[in-house]
Swiss-Prot record:
Keywords: ATP-binding, Carbohydrate metabolism, Glycogen biosynthesis, Glycogen metabolism, Nucleotide-binding, Nucleotidyltransferase, Transferase. It catalyses: alpha-D-glucose 1-phosphate + ATP + H(+) = ADP-alpha-D-glucose + diphosphate. The gene is glgC. NCBIfam families: glgC, PRK00725.1, PRK00844.1. GO terms for biological process: glycogen biosynthetic process. Pfam families: Hexapep_GlmU, NTP_transferase. The keyword Nucleotidyltransferase applies. This is Glucose-1-phosphate adenylyltransferase. One of its GO terms (molecular function) is glucose-1-phosphate adenylyltransferase activity. Homotetramer. Alpha-D-glucose 1-phosphate binds at Y121, G186, E201, K202, S219.
Length: 427
């Protein structure tokens, strides 16, 4: 039986799936995506939505990257656990990520159910504990637990194969990051056989790697578990009064202490169409500055992350019914990405990412900015070094991103100087 993923035009989706060999069976694996995070460091972009629902790259949302990786690899039983302000995320999953074909294959948004009492999730491990009915229903041999808010390409099947070969209870995906940034991650120390000997969750003084003290081997927040071992660990963690019920802080160290944790080096992962330049690209866009810089990479002449690799496509149907972008009355865009449905009329866009359904009116200038869907930039307005959230209106003649002192009175400014205008704001 053939499976078709509806992503805009069904025929195109079917063509891609056929090319990727989607007749492969993955019946023994269940994927759980943790998508309940608040994303406080991305405020105000997360003021009205969960972090995985934040728009990215003109036509995507952050969750589209992990879902694309799982679907491209043929893992078609996916549960997305949501909690914090999840309405837009739930709606996106229901509209953009629906299968036509066997009902045994699905991407399901699963809000917090309070199955174990009148309490919300107390941590990432507690989220899975409270959702074990999903595991019991499917009875998989392996459970993938992936984060929902990173920008990257990965073939999870290669990690699963590595996990099976290791014979361990859990495999953690690891990547090298600068030691100066590693305090934001779980940090891994492993022996020559990839056995994790120590796992430190967000340490103040991260350890360097043996061959390069300036780098740290960090957890990507992606795990493969043998199912029985995961269930046992969650049950024991539930009854541990000292636990914070966190995957990285409690569950992974539990397996490390038992000698049952394996590390998978993300640098070994190869996806179709990748190059040496973009291989092992992974970005945590959890701060405004990181989010902004990831967008600036996209519009560079030779971006490190190539959105245009159709051998491993990043999928989304964010307003797929919109017409192409239009440039009229001498409107131009230079070194920019302009998404469908947008109109640049007698205005100039430079070094920017302009999302769907944006209007830039006569005489306006947009430079070095990220403009999210539905924004309106009025006549003669100037928007520079900014992030404008959805449906922001910049009135005629308004200037943002030029006078920092004035901007500080109205908007949030990141440590890197990026001005952020929140959703639905009228300037």
């Amino acid at each position: 039986m053939f499976l078709c993923l509806i992503v805009g035009k069904p025929a195109r989706g079917a063509e891609i799936l056929d090319r990727l060999g989607f007749v492969r069976s993955k019946q023994n694996v269940l994927a759980i995506v943790l998508a309940g995070g608040e994303g406080k460091r991305l405020f105000p972009l997360t003021e009205d939505r969960a972090k995985p629902a934040v728009p990215f790259g003109g036509t995507y949302r952050l969750i589209d990257f992990v879902l694309s990786n799982l679907v491209n690899a043929g893992y078609l039983k996916i549960c997305v656990l949501t909690q914090y302000k999840s309405h837009s995320l739930d709606r996106h999953i229901s509209q953009a990520w629906q299968f036509s074909g066997p009902t045994s294959q699905y991407i399901a948004s699963v809000p917090a159910q309070q199955r174990l009492g009148k309490r919300w999730y107390m941590g990432s491990a507690d989220a899975i504990l409270q959702s074990l009915n999903l595991v019991y229903d499917e009875r998989p041999d392996y459970v993938l637990v992936f984060g929902a808010d990173h920008v990257y390409r990965m073939d999870p099947e290669q990690m699963v194969a590595d996990h099976i070969a290791s014979g361990k209870a859990v495999t953690v995906a690891g990547i090298r990051v600068p030691r100066s940034e590693a305090s934001a991650f779980g940090c891994i120390q492993a022996d020559e056989n990839n056995n994790i000997t120590e796992f430190l969750e967000k340490p103040a003084d991260p350890p360097g790697t043996p061959d390069d003290p300036s780098m740290t081997f960090a957890s990507m927040g992606n795990y493969v578990f043998s199912t029985d071992a995961l269930i046992q660990a969650l049950k024991e963690d539930e009854n541990n009064p000292d636990s914070e019920h966190d995957m990285g802080g409690d569950i992974i160290p539990y397996f490390v202490s038992m000698g049952q944790a394996n590390v998978y080096d993300f640098n070994k992962n190869v996806v179709p169409g990748s190059t040496d330049r973009d291989r092992a690209y992974w970005r945590d866009v959890g701060t405004v500055d990181a989010f902004y810089e990831a967008h600036m990479d996209l519009i560079s002449v030779h971006p490190v992350f190539n959105l245009y690799n159709q051998q491993w496509p990043i999928r989304s149907t964010e307003r797929g019914d919109l017409p192409p972008a239009k440039f009229v009355q001498g409107g131009i865009a230079q070194a920019s990405m302009v998404a469908q449905g947008s109109i640049v009329s007698g205005s100039t866009v430079r070094n920017s990412v302009v999302s769907t359904d944006v209007v830039v009116e006569e005489g306006a200038t947009v430079e070095g900015s990220v403009i999210m869907p539905g924004a309106r930039i009025g006549k003669g307005a100037v928007v520079r070094h900014c992030i404008l959230d959805k449906n922001v209106v910049v009135s005629d003649g308004q200037v943002i991103g030029v006078d920092r002192e004035r901007d500080e009175q109205r908007f949030q400014i990141s440590p890197g100087g990026v001005v952020v205008v929140g959703k639905n704001f009228v300037v």
